[in-house]
Amino acid sequence: VFQKLSRYLGIEEIAGTFPMEAGGVNSMIPIVVAASQGIPIVDCDGMGRAFPELRMTTFNLGGVSSTPMAITDEKGNIGISETISNKWTERLARVQTVEMGASSLISIYPATGRQLKDHGIHGIVTLSEKIGEVIRSNDLEEATKLEKLLKLIDGLELFQGKMMDVIRKVEGGFNFGEATLEGLNQDAGSTMKIYFQNENLIAEKDGSVITMTPDLICMVDLETLMPVTTEALKYGKRIRVLALPCHEKWQTKEGINTVGPRYFGYDLDYIPLKELAIKGGHKHV
């Protein structure tokens, strides 16, 4: 699909590639592509995290077109799309992905070096590598590892708990859900709910919202700190809920309109993570 887009653009050799989001398998595929094609991977992405829609990128905020876009499936079907807006790119790609069996590979947001410099979130590949090094280190005690991780990501630990219930539904090609955790250790007696649409969007502790999109809500294993994705949530799983601030590009008016809580249907005005922590939360989702 990468080569198909290159031919469509009339470019003999693409100068490099980059991940569209720093989350899940989508952060790794560009590394494989770069290695197989013998080209550099640029140390940036378009989200600084993961979001459920293709238009939810800082490139979109900067007016960069997401198309031409190439899309393929495991059967070998390949399509090229040129759309009138990034919103239409998301709609058409979502429909095609559903028809392809709910899984597809895409090559998207062809961009110049200047566009990457102006609109990308820089250093995200390097940061991801450093996070992985901390999590996988065997010479650190659990408390030291957590402290080092939180310092690296400028994050907070929100909650320690055991997964008690997960409600899921698939709608419009998205995985919606609500996870309920029962507090452990210092959080014993408290309850946390996490609402997600592919990615975690809202964290609520004892009825008060304590973190909201576009700030990041990350669930990790209580002991190993290995990431726990929404797909891997199951009863009995012991989890730490961490949070870290989003990139400043998302805190603009256009950024909040694109990925803030109201876009996802929550009756909340965005309050930054650390400001919300000082206030002690925001009542009701």
Q: Across the structure, where does each feature detected by a protein language model lie?
A:
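C-terminal non-catalytic interaction/assembly regions of soluble proteins
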Residues: 166-285
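A structural-propensity feature for long, helix-poor, extended segments
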Residues: 56-96
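Oxyanion-binding "anion nests"
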Residues: 132-183
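Flexible, glycine/charged-enriched surface loops at secondary-structure junctions
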Residues: 13-14, 100-112, 140-160, 248-254
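Glycine-rich oxoanion-binding loops at beta->alpha junctions
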Residues: 1-15
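Short, acidic/small-residue loops that bind anionic groups at enzyme active sites
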Residues: 35-55
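Short glycine/serine/threonine-rich phosphate/pyrophosphate-binding segments
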Residues: 20-31, 49-52
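A short, small-residue-rich loop immediately preceding and capping a beta-strand
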Residues: 12-23, 41
